[in-house]
UniProtKB/Swiss-Prot annotation:
Belongs to the class-II aminoacyl-tRNA synthetase family. Phe-tRNA synthetase alpha subunit type 1 subfamily. It catalyses: tRNA(Phe) + L-phenylalanine + ATP = L-phenylalanyl-tRNA(Phe) + AMP + diphosphate + H(+). Tetramer of two alpha and two beta subunits. GO terms for cellular component: cytoplasm. It is found in: Cytoplasm. It comes from Pseudomonas fluorescens (strain SBW25). GO terms for biological process: phenylalanyl-tRNA aminoacylation. Mg(2+) binds at E252. The gene is pheS. Its cofactor is Mg(2+). This is Phenylalanine--tRNA ligase alpha subunit.
Length: 338
């Protein structure tokens, strides 16, 4: 048994001197494995007298249990040390500044739409929407646009068939609103519209906001005051505004609205072509035929309507000189509007 005590002492010393889990595993195999030294001692029991075997076997089992207990404790200690070292190597310095998440922002067209809608809802207008795939009647006939009008040609309008098309303006929403509601009516109609045109200042798809007010005793002075106040609030400055006589089939009288150039304050520049004025929208008093076809008596009610291109207003407000930049999805451009 002296040899057993010496073997146990040797095993315990080896366990305590192990510097890592792999070395500890080799020690376990060397002493406790199938061919380990303590296992081999157990196999020598067959050489002892029968009366000595139980006592010696018990001593060997106690020795193996002691070595196993110390080995497991050393293994736990080494694993804990390894984990602590790994955590220390991977630790995060919470005092360092974090990486900020890149935040998005509203598209300049969306910002412009919201700005327009905010003004008109503030003065009592509602928001009305309608289908982008429209029928010929609501897009043209109900708006007093005759069959020979150039806007009805395939060069300007995207047709699906003889009767269905992509709306060329949001005016059909006004017609549908008048058909479904009795005056007084106060609405703006924002939305996408489509025309067969594409260059530096035109896009086949663009956004438009049209407005309509129908009530008793509405006159051109009401229209003029509304538009002048809108432009003042939208551009956040006092601007000279003029109304030029024009023609639209759905309004009579009709006018084009020009405002003082926001780039040069009316002095003349490349943007306004040295005129000092910028065209911003069309407007007029709703034509009696349009009211009549919508089921409203033009002898009792009158109204005004106006329409503006959202991209046009956004270009002027933000100083953008190419319409196509709004649709290129270039984050370097869009990031300016956050």
């Amino acid at each position: 048994m002296e040899n057993l005590d010496a073997l146990v002492a040797q095993a315990l010393e080896a366990v305590q001197s192990a510097e890592d889990v792999n070395a500890l595993e080799q020690i376990r195999v060397h002493y406790l494995g199938k061919k380990g030294e303590l296992t081999q001692v157990m196999k020598t029991l067959g050489n002892l007298p029968a009366e000595e075997r139980p006592q010696v076997g018990a001593l060997i089992n106690v020795a193996k249990e002691r070595v196993t207990e110390v080995l497991n404790a050393r293994k736990a200690s080494l694993e804990e040390a390894d984990l602590a070292a790994k955590l220390a190597a991977e630790s995060i310095d919470v005092t360092l500044p974090g990486r900020g998440q890149a935040s998005g922002g509203l598209h300049p067209i969306t910002r412009t739409l919201e700005r327009i809608e905010q003004f008109f809802t503030h003065i009592g207008y509602g928001i009305a929407e309608g289908p982008e795939v429209e029928d010929d009647y609501h897009n043209f006939e109900a708006l007093n646009i005759p069959g020979h009008h150039p806007a009805r040609s395939m060069h300007d309008t995207f047709y699906f068939n003889a009767n269905m098309l992509l709306r060329t303006h949001t005016s059909p929403v006004q017609v549908r609103t008048m058909e479904a509601n009795k005056p007084p009516i106060r609405i703006v109609c924002p939305g996408r519209v489509y025309r067969s045109d594409s260059d530096i200042t035109h896009s086949p798809m663009f956004h438009q906001v049209e407005g309509l007010l129908v009530d008793r005793d509405i006159n051109f002075a009401d229209l003029k005051g509304t538009i002048e106040e809108f432009l003042r609030v939208f551009f956040e400055k006092e601007l000279a505004v003029r109304f030029r006589p024009s023609f639209f089939p759905f309004t009579e009288p009709s006018a084009e609205v020009d405002m003082e150039c926001v780039m040069c304050s009316g002095k003349g520049c490349r943007v306004c072509k040295q005129t000092g004025w910028l065209e911003v929208m069309g407007c007029g008093m709703v034509h009696p035929n349009v009211l009549r076809m919508s089921g409203i008596d033009p002898e009792e009610f009158s109204g005004f309507a106006f329409g503006m291109g959202v991209e046009r207003l956004a270009m002027l407000r933000y100083g953008v000189n190419d319409l196509r930049l709004f649709f290129d999805n270039d984050l370097r451009f869009l990031a300016q509007f956050r």
